[in-house]
């Protein structure tokens, strides 16, 4: 930020508000460090208003944003740009008896009143992540169970509280852990101190030994399950999706999203054993697997001495993998690292192997493909555990209330803006999983949440959120209402002038491709 302090700046983003108003504060501060003052005063003025909407507060925030923030929505340019549709397919599956037993055992364990394996200050967050890994695959949860047992072993031998490498291990598998941890801490009340780990008695040590035994039994059961029902259904889901793409005339390409790197590796092996050998590429935070390194080396060699190479290994690695997916691979298996910052409009099939509870994250995923430049309707495949009542209710909310999987616009800004934050919504879902034990309790809890959402997505709320999120420039639609053919001709004339000037000045220093109106220095 300091290096650009005195330079004119334009920040372009498709997702200015995701999980928190503090993201807005951060973006605005890059443009104008004095727009909102310090972060404490901003939080005091606006953060609490996010959960208790106040027309006057939102109007004030809107006025303060006007000088630095302009927004154009799809609906405002729909008559000038042909946006494609999105359509949903559901792949249902039933877990095997062994998978169901593992789920029940771990779920019951997480619902215990007292757990030693989870750091006291992170109990809620760790419980949410463990449930996400449990839903992802037996491979994802088994590694984490092993680490938790190891943490307890350390506590028993040293009688000293400690993390025991839990943070590092979970963040290596569940890549959004650090980000989620920061969001959860940010979402807590200001001034709330983290609880200290207690000192342990001999009685505690005995209970720890019993907990270690239970965790190791869970781990043993998880490792004994070599095939997952959901994984076995993946091939069927892909073929259904590819059949739909063929009908649409789209390329046979799919991106599969998972929240776990262990699950990612399991899916790679499964697909390569089922006819997709040599057609799969991985995308994750580190991108340090042998195949990715090979792709990167070949890409650098191919594009050396061109402006495609940025000099940033991280950025170039991402570009290399995306290019490989476009030109060579059929399937990309990605973690949340691919949900931001890459453009995949050449791909028309999105598979949510794991479905996040945060609707804003889902919208980000689908937005990689369902974006400007996409020529075909985007097919979105979601997996649904028919033996899990809570999973079915979550999908119902995401599909029917947030409208994430169908239509031209997907989840509208009014609807995504109606929840306090993506983090808060995740917490609400996690609480239902944690507190409800019977299908009746689950039904009641989700009905209450749905009722709240219906109230929050009322006409009054829509109007308030629209004023904040959309109408920074109320004349934008009128400004765009010009004759389309005239505007094309007008642009064409000036583009040709610019092209001819460029060729004149760079004629000796660049290779020009006239048919594509592009050049390489």
Segment roles from a protein language model:
Residues 1-49, 339, 346-364, 368-378, ...:
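Signature of the SF2 helicase/ATPase Hel1-core->accessory helical subdomain module
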Residues 1-6, 29-168, 390-454, 458:
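Inter-lobe coupling linker of SF2 helicases/translocases
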Residues 6-10, 253, 328-331:
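Loop/turn-to-beta-strand initiation segments
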Residues 12-16, 73, 138, 258-261, ...:
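A short beta-strand-to-loop transition that corresponds to the Sensor-1 phosphate-sensing loop
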Residues 83-95, 141-328, 478-516:
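Conserved Helicase C-terminal RecA-like lobe
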Residues 272, 277-391:
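Conserved RecA-like P-loop NTPase helicase motor core
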Residues 376-521:
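C-terminal accessory region of SF2 helicases/translocases
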């Amino acid at each position: 930020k300091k290096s650009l302090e005195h330079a004119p700046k334009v920040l372009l983003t498709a997702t200015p508000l995701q999980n928190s108003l503090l993201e807005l504060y951060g973006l605005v501060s890059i443009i104008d460090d004095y727009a909102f003052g310090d972060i404490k005063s901003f939080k005091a003025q606006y953060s609490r208003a996010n959960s208790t909407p106040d027309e006057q507060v939102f109007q004030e925030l809107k006025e303060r944003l006007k000088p630095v923030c302009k927004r154009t929505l799809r609906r405002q340019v729909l008559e000038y740009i042909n946006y494609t549709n999105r359509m949903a397919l559901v792949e249902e599956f039933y877990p095997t008896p062994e998978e169901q037993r593992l789920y029940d055992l771990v779920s019951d364990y997480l619902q215990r009143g007292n757990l030693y394996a989870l750091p006291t200050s992170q109990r809620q967050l760790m419980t949410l992540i463990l449930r996400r890994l449990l839903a992802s695959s037996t491979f994802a949860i088994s590694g984490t169970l092993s680490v938790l047992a190891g943490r307890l072993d350390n506590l028993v031998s040293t009688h000293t509280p400690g993390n025991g490498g839990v943070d590092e291990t979970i963040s290596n598998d569940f890549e959004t852990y650090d980000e989620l941890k920061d969001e959860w801490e940010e979402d807590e009340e200001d001034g709330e101190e983290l609880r200290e780990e207690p000192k342990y008695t001999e009685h505690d040590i005995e209970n720890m030994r019993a907990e270690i035994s239970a965790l190791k039994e869970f781990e043993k059961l998880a490792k004994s399950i070599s095939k997952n029902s959901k994984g076995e259904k993946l091939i069927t889901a892909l073929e259904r999706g590819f059949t739909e793409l063929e009908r649409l005339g789209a390329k046979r390409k799919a991106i599969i999203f998972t929240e776990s790197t262990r699950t990612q590796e399991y899916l790679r092996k499964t697909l390569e054993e089922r006819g997709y050998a040599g057609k799969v590429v991985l995308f994750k935070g580190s991108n340090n697997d042998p195949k990715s390194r090979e792709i990167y080396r070949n890409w650098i060699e191919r594009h050396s001495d061109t402006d495609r190479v940025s000099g940033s290994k991280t950025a170039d690695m991402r570009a290399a993998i995306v290019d490989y997916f476009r030109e060579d691979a059929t399937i990309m298996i990605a973690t949340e690292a691919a949900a931001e910052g890459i453009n995949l409009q050449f791909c028309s099939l999105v598979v949510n192997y794991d479905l996040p509870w945060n609707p804003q994250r889902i919208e980000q995923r689908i937005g990689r493909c369902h974006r400007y430049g996409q020529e075909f309707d985007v097919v979105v495949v979601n997996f649904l555990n028919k033996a899990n009542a809570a999973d079915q209710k979550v999908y119902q909310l995401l599909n029917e209330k947030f409208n994430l999987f169908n239509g031209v616009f997907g989840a509208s800004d009014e609807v995504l803006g109606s929840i306090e934050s993506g983090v808060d919504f995740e917490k609400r879902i996690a609480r239902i999983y944690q507190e409800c034990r019977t299908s009746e309790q689950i039904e009641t809890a989700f009905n209450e949440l749905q009722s709240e959402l219906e109230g929050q997505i009322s006409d009054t709320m829509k109007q308030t959120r629209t004023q904040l999120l959309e109408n920074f420039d109320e004349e934008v639609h009128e400004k765009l209402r010009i004759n389309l053919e005239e505007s094309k001709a007008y642009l064409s004339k000036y583009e040709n002038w610019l092209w001819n000037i460029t060729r004149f000045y760079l004629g000796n220093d660049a290779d020009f491709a006239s048919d594509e109106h592009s050049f390489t220095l």
